[in-house]
Amino acid sequence: MSALTTAFGCKSGPDILTSSSSVRDPKPTKAGPKSERMYGLEGATFAAYVPFYAPCFTTYIGDEDVSEKPIRLFHGAADDYVPVAPCRAYVERLSKVGKDVTLVEYPDAHHAFDNPLLKVGPAPQSQTTRRCMMTEEPVGTIINAVTKQPFTMEDPCVERGPNLGYNAAATASATQAVKEFLQVTLKLK
């Protein structure tokens, strides 16, 4: 989770939770969405989803059946750790089925652009699945879409050395965008 989303945290109470988790949480069930069950928030609902650097290169079964709550994705256009292109396609698919979803891209911003402790540059030992395309099988197994075998971090598509780094302009813009979005969504204005 990014430093920016951590700063907003969660507010409890009916219908005012926000989440930076995947936008692909399943529809609410009697016990609540999976993330709500995992974190002990049963009975509460999320008001919005605000993922940063979302990994959109896995196609899940039913991944267009997401919450009716607004989804705002924030991504660096220069992110080569978790590239933005698959998110563009996913947002387009979600929009076509009537979801309230927006992708905001920041030019020249890399992965972790909101972390002021990171200088822009490669992370030589970090693994990235940026060249991998994965799909979910009916039994829940994630497979490599090219090899049709269960995905592992040993697959040839896994690479090392993506770039990371702080971008002050992107951070300031994203911070303002998230604040404004949450003020409207949570009816704080």
Predicted features by range, described:
Residues 100-189:
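C-terminal catalytic histidine-bearing segment of alpha/beta-hydrolase fold enzymes
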Residues 1-68, 78-81, 85:
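Primarily recognizes the serine-hydrolase "nucleophile elbow" in alpha/beta-hydrolase
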Residues 18, 70, 100-102:
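Residues at the starts of beta-strands that form the adenosine-phosphate
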